[in-house]
Amino acid sequence: MGSKKLKRVGLSQELCDRLSRHQILTCQDFLCLSPLELMKVTGLSYRGVHELLCMVSRACAPKMQTAYGIKAQRSADFSPAFLSTTLSALDEALHGGVACGSLTEITGPPGCGKTQFCIMMSILATLPTNMGGLEGAVVYIDTESAFSAERLVEIAESRFPRYFNTEEKLLLTSSKVHLYRELTCDEVLQRIESLEEEIISKGIKLVILDSVASVVRKEFDAQLQGNLKERNKFLAREASSLKYLAEEFSIPVILTNQITTHLSGALASQADLVSPADDLSLSEGTSGSSCVIAALGNTWSHSVNTRLILQYLDSERRQILIAKSPLAPFTSFVYTIKEEGLVLQETTFCSVTQAELNWAPEILPPQPPEQLGLQMCHHTQLIF
């Protein structure tokens, strides 16, 4: 909670302005300075600085809560606990949809519908609460320049034709989606760490980052000495900031991730196909074996609360798999992508056992083995 702005701690406006002139904006910035440095910046006595340090420390330190207290607080809170995906079977499995106050990751190969899902959720967050929405605005951070305003309008008109029956409603919804194109790691982190005031002033109810892996894999080569450590440090800071925003404002945060091929030692030595951006040790399996896994490695995978995998079944059908969730079992759904976005083909869901996962379809699109030159690992979903 060190990213909390000093303006929200209870300091006077005059003091906040004085601190901001020295680039001291957050609790972390303040607490990293010594008492002597703070005396110089604020012009206060040692006792005055000590009182400020105690105030800021109390404001950003996590407070002890009992389980009963948390339950009572959530019962008294009238804000929604979930954002519905309008995919009824998926919502049922997730006990309501995408959880507020947590990080939900969507991972899969290119073209399987990750951005389509994000655009669809952007529309849903702006809808009135009686339609399952959050009646708020959206921050959409686009690192791949994949967002399409035309597609947003098309999904809105096709999915909710009765509601979006006038141009005014379409304009209102599109004006609530605030798009930021950030193409470097520093830009993404700066944007995330500056969102607190925007969430308050603009009534932001959903934050989307599409995608996490795009900028990280371009800027960090894990094979270079020191890069892996710096990359993990960046990812930890990014995840911490996003979790703070999700928990502090009880909003859902949706992230997209890419996939990577994980090769055994023998095959990796013959062909340099292992993504350097993934801190994964080579498998000890059979010579020449490989599998497909979510990018960014184990460090990142433990940061997200829920992981949904999108994967191909054939040229038309795709599959959503709940691979990680504190509420739902391993579950899969078949869907297609149409004008109205993602559409489930089956209204019921089935739990997937560990044995059945070993026979689940590959994450990659169907290709002849001679084109791949690899033996795909069918237990992809278990490596998280």
Curated annotation (Swiss-Prot):
Its main location: nucleus. One of its GO terms (cellular component) is Rad51B-Rad51C-Rad51D-XRCC2 complex. One of its GO terms (molecular function) is ATP-dependent DNA damage sensor activity. Phosphorylated on tyrosine residues by BCR-ABL. The record marks 252-253 as: Breakpoint for translocation to form HMGA2-RAD51B. GO terms for biological process: blastocyst growth; DNA recombination; DNA repair; double-strand break repair via homologous recombination; positive regulation of cell population proliferation; positive regulation of G2/M transition of mitotic cell cycle; reciprocal meiotic recombination; somite development. It is found in: Nucleus. PROSITE patterns: RECA_2. Gene3D superfamilies: P-loop containing nucleotide triphosphate hydrolases. CDD domains: Rad51B. ATP binds at residues 108-115. Keywords: ATP-binding, Chromosomal rearrangement, DNA damage, DNA recombination, DNA repair, DNA-binding, Nucleotide-binding, Nucleus, Phosphoprotein. Expressed in a wide range of tissues. Pfam families: Rad51. Residues 1-75 are annotated as: Interaction with RAD51C. Belongs to the RecA family. RAD51 subfamily. Involved in the homologous recombination repair (HRR) pathway of double-stranded DNA breaks arising during DNA replication or induced by DNA-damaging agents. May promote the assembly of presynaptic RAD51 nucleoprotein filaments. Binds single-stranded DNA and double-stranded DNA and has DNA-dependent ATPase activity. Part of the RAD51 paralog protein complex BCDX2 which acts in the BRCA1-BRCA2-dependent HR pathway. Upon DNA damage, BCDX2 acts downstream of BRCA2 recruitment and upstream of RAD51 recruitment. It is linked to A chromosomal aberration involving RAD51B is found in pulmonary chondroid hamartoma. Translocation t(6;14)(p21;q23-24) with HMGA1. A chromosomal aberration involving RAD51B is found in uterine leiomyoma. Translocation t(12;14)(q15;q23-24) with HMGA2. Part of the BCDX2 complex consisting of RAD51B, RAD51C, RAD51D and XRCC2; the complex has a ring-like structure arranged into a flat disc around a central channel. The BCDX2 subcomplex RAD51B:RAD51C interacts with RAD51. Interacts with SWSAP1; involved in homologous recombination repair. Interacts with HELQ. This is DNA repair protein RAD51 homolog 2. It comes from Homo sapiens (Human). The gene is RAD51B.
